[in-house]
Curated annotation (Swiss-Prot):
The keyword Membrane does not apply. The lineage of its organism: Eukaryota, Fungi, Fungi incertae sedis, Microsporidia, Unikaryonidae. GO terms for cellular component: spore wall. Keywords: Signal, Sporulation. Residues 1-23 form the signal peptide. This is Spore wall protein 7. It comes from Encephalitozoon cuniculi (strain GB-M1). One of its GO terms (biological process) is sporulation resulting in formation of a cellular spore. The keyword Signal applies. Disulfide bonds: none annotated. It is found in: Spore wall.
Length: 295
């Protein structure tokens, strides 16, 4: 009988383990684990509140000049260029992003804050995002502010200006994403990357203008921990659980979150004009008669 010594045996065991790891990573066996965060007939809707500085607002409104006003332009940009494609990818986790841009002008969100428009005195993206994040935390006593996206513009770009930053609170659901505006196309991947980091902790995904690799996608699966912790059955500033939705369907999620049920100590976007408070959903009919903002 052939006896294998301990050293070759350990070598074989190591090779087998390495082979199994490779097979799992590259799906050699054709088996693909379901990444969904739930097996139930429901989707986790993560609310995100979007804000832009004046330079970014002007740039987007100029690029989408057929939109009737600034708010419609920024909503159209996020809806068609960023959140729509991102949700198509995120749907495998049974998670979607619903964005709210009613409070789109950051100068109205924090009217007392004045930032260095030259972007030369201090690093702008981190400094501005941190300042507004702390302002929101200090304004709402229970620190329930949800996830906020801030797009910042600068007259010039240099290596000392960071492309994005994500600020979070330990063991809390509050997040602030700061992104440097680089134009309607180049900024998209940085926004997707910032959202991914805010909801999963995975850094620098989507920055290669493509989808994450299988290994990186596994990092994004930590979104399940975020929604399990932050999204409850009752709608809140963090989002809501939408029941009876087929994750493979292209139909719009039309259920509105009733933010009027939120406690007064959480962030609630202001009512503006005749529009009801709501979250914008991908493919949801617009309030505008002309929804085709041309680029």
């Amino acid at each position: 009988m052939f006896l294998m010594t301990s050293t070759p045996l350990l070598l074989v065991i190591g090779l087998v383990r390495e082979g199994l790891a490779l097979a799992s990573e590259y799906n050699f066996g054709g088996f693909e684990a379901d990444p969904a965060c739930t097996k139930d007939d429901k989707i986790y809707l993560v609310s995100m509140y979007a804000h832009f500085d004046r330079g970014t607002i002007d740039a987007i409104f100029s690029a989408f000049s057929d939109c009737k006003d600034e708010r419609e332009a920024v909503e159209h940009y996020l809806k068609s260029r960023v959140i729509g494609p991102y949700n198509d990818y995120l749907s495998k986790f049974k998670v979607k992003i619903g964005f709210d841009a009613k409070d789109y002008d950051v100068n109205e969100l924090v009217p007392t804050k004045r930032f260095d428009s030259s972007c030369e005195l201090v690093e702008p993206v981190g400094t501005r995002t941190s300042a507004v994040h702390n302002h929101l935390l200090n304004t709402y006593k229970d620190r329930k502010i949800g996830i906020h996206l801030f797009l910042w513009s600068c007259p010039t770009h240099n290596e000392n200006i960071m492309d994005k930053i994500v600020i979070g609170e330990p063991k809390e659901c509050a997040r602030s994403i700061g992104v440097l505006w680089r134009g309607t196309e180049e900024t998209i991947d940085f926004i997707k990357s910032g959202i991914s980091e805010a909801i999963s902790g995975a850094k620098d995904l989507f920055l290669n203008q493509g989808f994450p690799s299988p290994r990186d996608e596994d990092k994004l699966s930590y979104v399940c921990q975020h929604v399990d912790t932050c999204i409850a059955s009752k709608p809140s500033v963090n989002g809501a659980i939408i029941f009876g939705i087929d994750e493979t369907s292209d139909d719009a999620i039309s259920t509105h979150i009733d933010v009027d049920t939120h406690p007064s100590d959480v962030y609630i976007p202001p009512q503006r004009g005749a529009r009801a408070q709501r979250v914008i959903y991908v493919n949801e009919p617009s309030d505008s008669v002309d929804d085709e903002c041309k680029y």
